[in-house]
Amino acid sequence: MSDFSFSPFESISGYILQPLNNVMNTTVSGLSSAISAPLNLASIIFIFLYGYNVMTGRVALSMNSLLNNVVKIVIVTTMATNADTFNTYVKNIFFGDLANAIGNALNSNPSSANVFDYILLKTSARYQEVLAAAWFLEKIMVGLLGSLMIMAVIVFCIGGFIVQMFAQVALVMIIGLGPLFISLYLFNATRKFTDAWITTLVNFTILQVLVIMLGTIMCKIILYVLDGTYESIYFLFPPVVVISIVGAILFRALPGIASALSSGGPYFNAGISSGGQIFTMLSSGAKTGRNAAKSAASTLSGAAGTATKAAKIGGNGRGRF
């Protein structure tokens, strides 16, 4: 498995993203065509009436203000009604170029595989090495601990992959509706919807970038652990499992961090809340186990008392015969 030819996450990503890309292109093209005629007509009427009022002195504005408004209208109309221009300046930048550039800058994998594929396959390869070096009877314990270790890494990779796919699917829906929300910028009453659309677009773009950054960081940490020299899997198992659990918690906190970054505020409660929820889950499990043990103990004590009474009754009965 050292050639990293098996890439499950990369394959699944390809199956998902290709239809999404087609849907986004179709949606952008359809919306641009649908709003082209009414938006161009409204822009022409607005420029004509606004310019007429400025030139006749009915509106106290300078020609510079008129030119600025005309330039804004031309830019918004071009972005909203021209699908090729929209794809060049919005779709390609936020959906592909930005994430790919950051991923290429951070990702130093010696293969072209997805970062989660690289982590999973590297862990599996190291597990095979430790299993091959174990003696015969130890292979059972090595196989058990190695399977648990790989399961922890799989949970970590699946968690990160789900967050990444969530960000990309959300970006497809947001970018697909871009021409409509951009056209709303022309009117003061609907400009707030365009501002909200831009904030949401930046939010999920940051989320996608954070997934790439965290995946790369955790990849380097896990690979640093795996590249060490271990005489037994007992020394390899704890750090890999702990790092995988911490990584899964951090992936769960990424949407909140991205939302805080897009709004300009710090976010320190995500990891604490996630850890608190896990602690609550574990404590609830412990309480459930304790209650089950108490119930079993009370049942056993009740059965023992019943057996004692039955023995006494049986003894009394034999005495009367």
UniProtKB/Swiss-Prot annotation:
GO CC terms, sorted: plasma membrane
Subcellular location: Cell inner membrane
Coiled-coil intervals, chain numbering: none
A Pfam family the protein falls into: TrbL
Residues passing through the membrane, by range: 30-50, 59-79, 142-162, 169-189, 206-226, 231-251
Entry keywords, A to Z: Cell inner membrane, Cell membrane, Membrane, Transmembrane, Transmembrane helix, Transport, Virulence
Induction of synthesis: During the interaction with the intracellular environment of host cells.
Cited InterPro entries: Conjugal_tfr_TrbL/VirB6 (IPR007688)
Membrane topology: Multi-pass membrane protein
GO biological process, any: protein secretion by the type IV secretion system
Keyword Lipid metabolism: no
Entry function: The type IV secretion system VirB/VirD4 is a major virulence determinant for subversion of human endothelial cell (HEC) function. VirB-dependent changes of HEC include massive cytoskeletal rearrangements, a pro-inflammatory activation by nuclear factor NF-kappa-B, inhibition of early and late events of apoptosis, leading to an increased cell survival, and, at high infection doses, a cytostatic or cytotoxic effect, which interferes with a potent VirB-independent mitogenic activity. These changes of HEC require the T4S coupling protein VirD4 and at least one of the effector proteins BepA-G.
Homology family: Belongs to the TrbL/VirB6 family.
Identification of the protein by name: Type IV secretion system protein VirB6
Taxonomic classification: Bacteria, Pseudomonadati, Pseudomonadota, Alphaproteobacteria, Hyphomicrobiales
